Design a protein with these regions (language model features):
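Short acidic, low-complexity intrinsically disordered linear motifs used
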Residues: 1-7
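Pepsin/retropepsin-fold aspartyl endopeptidases
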Residues: 7-155
Length: 155
């Protein structure tokens, strides 16, 4: 009986049930960096969510990156090769800790990019599933407080 209870109580063994609705823009907190405006992209099937940073230096299995003057050193987990308009953008993947909707998520894979994008932090489908939310494309900041755009180019 104990094995059955242990099996059922693990999230991975349960059918996905998303009864929380989020907006397509929400506030997400990246551990060590702070709050950021995130776009929940249901069409993003890449291996990692995308985060636009200022500098990236990959040497061996170590990634040194910088965003708004804050410096980070992370272990390289792999490389994402998303294609957009037939252009391939190589993004080193690192793991970060993220807080969303008062829940703390460890080892969230993010692909770092220095190319300017319409969104500073683009959440992929895997992370949306991990957040256990339905995304309403007509609403913003349903589960979190409003946060301004990082720059004038943000959507």
């Amino acid at each position: 009986m104990k094995e059955l209870f242990d099996y059922i109580t693990q999230d991975i063994h349960r059918k996905h049930s998303f009864n929380k609705e989020s907006g397509f823009h929400e506030r997400v907190v990246i551990d060590g960096y702070g709050p950021i405006r995130a776009k929940f992209d249901t069409g993003n099937g890449t291996h990692a969510s995308m985060f636009v940073v200022d500098k990236i230096d990959v040497s061996g299995k170590t990634v040194k990156w910088e965003k708004d003057g804050k410096k980070f050193t992370s272990k390289l987990q792999g490389t994402s090769h998303p294609t957009h308009n037939e252009k391939i953008d190589e993004r080193p993947i690192v793991l970060v800790n993220v807080t969303f909707n008062n829940k703390f998520y460890t080892d969230v894979p993010i692909g770092l990019s220095i190319k300017d994008s319409k969104s500073t932090f683009l959440v992929n489908r895997d992370l949306i599933t991990r957040f256990k939310v339905n995304v309403n494309p007509n609403r913003k900041f349903v589960l979190s407080k409003w946060i301004e755009r990082s720059d004038g180019n943000d959507a």
